[in-house]
Amino acid sequence: MKLTVFLRPSRDRPDGVWVASEGPEGDPAGKEAEPAQPVSSLLGSPACGPIRAGLGWVRDGPRSHPYNFPAGSGGSILRSSSTPVQGTVPVDLASRQEEEEQSPDSTEEEPVTLPRRTTNDGFHLLKAGGSCFALISGTANQVKCYRFRVKKNHRHRYENCTTTWFTVADNGAERQGQAQILITFGSPSQRQDFLKHVPLPPGMNISGFTASLDF
């Protein structure tokens, strides 16, 4: 059996020739072995894959730069211009921009003013043939409590009842007199039934009258 030991390629032999040491069967040292396949032929082999070019090779001279710069460019590919751009905006364009800034955004919602309700729902406090009333007065707390009890327990004994109201004075929101409510009845007999079954708390006053429409 013949055993040959290969050493790394000599840098002075670019042709890929390997130098073998003395073998076990007495081969003299320094004997040239069979030339190895150059690395350049293996680069395109699909079985070997990519191999670093220049492995064991010596590059002659400096590597050329992949980009060629013109003389006096200082090695820069892009040169920035420091000259400012000067110009004037046309008058019509400036006025148009000013109008756009002043014009409101069309997407903004404008407040919608709803018309006041004027539909006649058929309710009238006074009837054409005359109406019977009971005017009840007292402190604000008394009148509110009385109206609450009447509406809750005696709703079938009258027709309509107003909210608590005051008579205004001459200056601003000044009030004069006591708080009052107005209760309407369909007939004098209904008002008598109301006065009979609905007691009036102490400190409150009641007055009855009949009113008719003049127009």
Curated annotation (Swiss-Prot):
Keywords assigned by UniProt, alphabetized: Host nucleus
A cellular component annotation (GO) from this entry: host cell nucleus
SUPFAM superfamilies: Viral DNA-binding domain
Localization of this protein: Host nucleus
Region (Disordered): 1-45, 68-87, 94-119
Major localisation: host cell
UniProt GO molecular function: DNA binding; DNA-binding transcription factor activity
Pfam families: PPV_E2_C
Role of this protein: Plays a role in limiting the replication of viral DNA in keratinocytes. Recruits the host NCoR/SMRT complex to viral replication foci to mediate repression of both viral replication and transcription.
Family from the record: Belongs to the papillomaviridae E8^E2C protein family.
Listed name of the protein: Protein E8^E2C
Species in which this protein is naturally found: Bovine papillomavirus type 1
Source species taxonomy: Viruses, Monodnaviria, Shotokuvirae, Cossaviricota, Papovaviricetes
